[in-house]
C-alpha cells in the first residue's frame, strides 16, 4: 500500500519530543536522519545519539487526513502555527522484493562467495555460503564485513576453532566453517542474531559444528585459534580485556567495524598482548589484525 511521509527539521535535543508528537498524531513509524549527512558514532549503553541538526520523519497510512495531523502538530510548543514541514506521497513498492532483487552473489578473496539463498551460485566449485540475513546484520555488502571475509579467506583454517564475536547473521562463523574450520562459536547480545545464525548454519549444512551463545551463557574457559569481532570501535575498546583472552597463545585476531580515524585508539587497546599487522582500509573503514604474543 502507498504511504504518506511527513518530515520535520529540528535539533537533536528536540528530536525525541517531536517523535512522540508524530506518534500521537498517528504515525506508524519514525525515522531520524542527519540533515547534513554527518557520521554519528556508536552511543553509550542506554543512550540515543543524535545529530545537532536532525530530520524527524513520520510515516502515515495513505488514508490519513494530513490536514488534521498538521493542525494537531501546530499545538505542540516546539512547533506552533505554520511550522516548516514537508509532506510527500511514497510510491507503493514491495520493499522486501526490491531488496532481494538487489542482493547479488559476491566474491571475497580467492575462494569464497556469499550468495543469497534465493539465487543460484555462480561457481559450484567455489566455497559458497548461502545467506538469508533475516533481521540480523551481515550480508557482506558493508566494507567491514567484506574486510573480515577477505581476511578469513586468506587464512589456513583447516582443523581450527574460530570465534565470531558479535556474530549477527552468522556470516563470518559460517564462512570460517565452509573454509575448513573444525568448529566455530558465535556470540551475540541479540537473540534475533542467534536465531538468524542458527537458520543460516542449517541452510549451509554446518549446524553441528557451530555453537551459539548469548554473552551471559558463554563458557568461561572458551578459547579459539582465530577470533574475529566485527562490531564497533567503542565496544572493541571497552571489551578489549574480554576479547584479548579468547585467542590461544599464537592465535590470530581480526577486528573491524572501525572507521579509519578510530584505528589508532583501537590498536592501543590491543597492542600489549598482540603483534599487530598494518591496518587495512576500505571506504573509510578498516581492519586490524594481529597474532597473540
UniProtKB/Swiss-Prot annotation:
Pfam families per record: PrmA
Keyword Cytoplasm attached: yes
GO CC, one annotated term: cytosol
Location in or out of the cell = Cytoplasm
Keywords from UniProt, A to Z, are:
Cytoplasm, Methyltransferase, S-adenosyl-L-methionine, Transferase
Question: Record's InterPro entries?
Answer: Ribosomal_L11_MeTrfase_PrmA, Ribosomal_PrmA_MeTrfase, SAM-dependent_MTases_sf
User: What enzyme class is recorded for this protein?
Assistant: transferase
EC number(s) given by UniProt: 2.1.1.-
Q: Is Protease found in the keyword set?
A: no
Q: A GO molecular function for this record?
A: protein-lysine N-methyltransferase activity
Q: Which reaction does it catalyse?
A: L-lysyl-[protein] + 3 S-adenosyl-L-methionine = N(6),N(6),N(6)-trimethyl-L-lysyl-[protein] + 3 S-adenosyl-L-homocysteine + 3 H(+)
Which SUPFAM superfamilies does the protein's record reference? S-adenosyl-L-methionine-dependent methyltransferases
Query: Coiled coil located at which positions?
Result: none
The UniProt record gives the binding positions of S-adenosyl-L-methionine as 145, 166, 188, 230
Q: Which GO terms describe its biological process?
A: methylation
Per the entry, what this protein does is:
Methylates ribosomal protein L11.
For this protein, the record's PANTHER family field holds: ELECTRON TRANSFER FLAVOPROTEIN BETA SUBUNIT LYSINE METHYLTRANSFERASE
Q: Which family does it belong to?
A: Belongs to the methyltransferase superfamily. PrmA family.
HAMAP family named among the record's database cross-references:
Methyltr_PrmA
Task: Write the protein's name.
Answer: Ribosomal protein L11 methyltransferase
Q: Which organism is it from?
A: Klebsiella pneumoniae subsp. pneumoniae (strain ATCC 700721 / MGH 78578)
The record lists the lineage as: Bacteria, Pseudomonadati, Pseudomonadota, Gammaproteobacteria, Enterobacterales
Amino acid at each position: 500500500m502507498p504511504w504518506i511521509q511527513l518530515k520535520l527539521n529540528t535539533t537533536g535535543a528536540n528530536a525525541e519530543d517531536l517523535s512522540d508528537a508524530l506518534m500521537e498524531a498517528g504515525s506508524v513509524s519514525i525515522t531520524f536522519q542527519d540533515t547534513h549527512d554527518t557520521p554519528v558514532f556508536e552511543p553509550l549503553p542506554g543512550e540515543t545519539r543524535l545529530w545537532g541538526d536532525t530530520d524527524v520523519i513520520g510515516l502515515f497510512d495513505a488514508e490519513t487526513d494530513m490536514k488534521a495531523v498538521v493542525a494537531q502538530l501546530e499545538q505542540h510548543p516546539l512547533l506552533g502555527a505554520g511550522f516548516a514541514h514537508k509532506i510527500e506521497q511514497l510510491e507503493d513498492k514491495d520493499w522486501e522484493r526490491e531488496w532481494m532483487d538487489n542482493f547479488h552473489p559476491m566474491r571475497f578473496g580467492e575462494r569464497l562467495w556469499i550468495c543469497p539463498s534465493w539465487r543460484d551460485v555462480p561457481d559450484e566449485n567455489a566455497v559458497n555460503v548461502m545467506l538469508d540475513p533475516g533481521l540480523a546484520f551481515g550480508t557482506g555488502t558493508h566494507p567491514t564485513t567484506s574486510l573480515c571475509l577477505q581476511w578469513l579467506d586468506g587464512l589456513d583454517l583447516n582443523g581450527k576453532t574460530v570465534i565470531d564475536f558479535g556474530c549477527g547473521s552468522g556470516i563470518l562463523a559460517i564462512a570460517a566453517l565452509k573454509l575448513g574450520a573444525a568448529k566455530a562459536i558465535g556470540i551475540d547480545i541479540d537473540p534475533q542474531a542467534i536465531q538468524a545464525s542458527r537458520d543460516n548454519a542449517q541452510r549451509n549444512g554446518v549446524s553441528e559444528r557451530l555453537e551459539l551463545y548469548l554473552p551471559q551463557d558463554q563458557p568461561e574457559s572458551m578459547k579459539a585459534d582465530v577470533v574475529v569481532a566485527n562490531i564497533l570501535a567503542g565496544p572493541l575498546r571497552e571489551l578489549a580485556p574480554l576479547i584479548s583472552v579468547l585467542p590461544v597463545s599464537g592465535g590470530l585476531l581480526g577486528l573491524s567495524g572501525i572507521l579509519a580515524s578510530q584505528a589508532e585508539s583501537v590498536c592501543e587497546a590491543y597492542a600489549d598482548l598482540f603483534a599487530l599487522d598494518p591496518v587495512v582500509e576500505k571506504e573509510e573503514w578498516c581492519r586490524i589484525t594481529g597474532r597473540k604474543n
